[in-house]
């Protein structure tokens, strides 16, 4: 239970000194993540680890063929899943990126920037070993538009000294009556094995930090469970991949310091184009969702939310996996990705909004174009009914734009003589880009670049507000801009 106490700078200094003592963990190798921020609330996440960092000097995994992977998955061959990917005589703890969790207790301190004397301090709480040694705090009654500072402490158990501490911060959105310039970044599709800085992670993270965004959105495919090194066909291997990725310095530092919204897509929960009934090895589709929603990321009762960021901007974050049915069903009014409740919520909240600019953020395309062989998103022919239903609604709105992830190329699509615009942010590294040919520039394309990077969106408030969509390369350099 959170309790408010006055705590001075001397007290904070004392706790910091304690944390420097030679104590063997637990530590915060996976840092802090936050999620679902609105004007008055946010969710904070952390995990306790045995070591200060992951074992990035461990042994490499063995690559097996995709055919072998599929056989192991279909036959639920747990012994084979490990023995074919881990060298003989070794175990998972010997492998590159191993970052085991550990039991212990955590305590949260947070305060409005510049007001450490009014810090709110939580009780010491044990992390949950059944949820990968993680813990979450749901903070409420916060102040809109304020920047908060965070410090979390760790100790092995009650009565023992502090073993580690970690700093972080987050910014809450201003209320709907406050004019405010807002900038945010959107990314998609990057995993550990396709990072472009082997020592640190993905270069887009320091590049985005240079822009000083107010918040950040990851549209999903954060990690690929169905890619090698290793193929994660058990819960243990899924957790291994999450823990390894979030121990990378670039990722960890960025998440500690920025308000974030984490979405999911197919590869995060199992196999490519996953849906109910499409399990991956020993991990059911539903369990993959649960590990993402309840364990590895900040938790929210619904996986969709709309957030007002000041007078001129409102965003909609929609969920593309939890409420869908099977891809192979015949198209029609009952076939869905969004689900009936989420879809009606979107229509109702957009109609109720008076924001100057509205941005729908989705894990996968609605307009496209996409590849002909795909049948997993609203731009594909297998979902034409629901696509038309949503686009017919968007056509009637003013200044409502679609931003999406999933596709491994950057693009801007506009359907002439309509209000339909879609901005694909692209993959997080050049090595991850592909799936489309640069020369395949369609009539609806306003911009096309088969390279990695990210998207930034800037809303300038005032008497004549505007919104700017900028595609960046991995180093942060602008490669395309569209202003409305």
Q: Which positions does each model-derived feature cover?
A:
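Bacterial Sec-dependent N-terminal signal peptides
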Residues: 1-23
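Metal-dependent phosphoester/phosphodiester hydrolase catalytic core
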Residues: 20-484
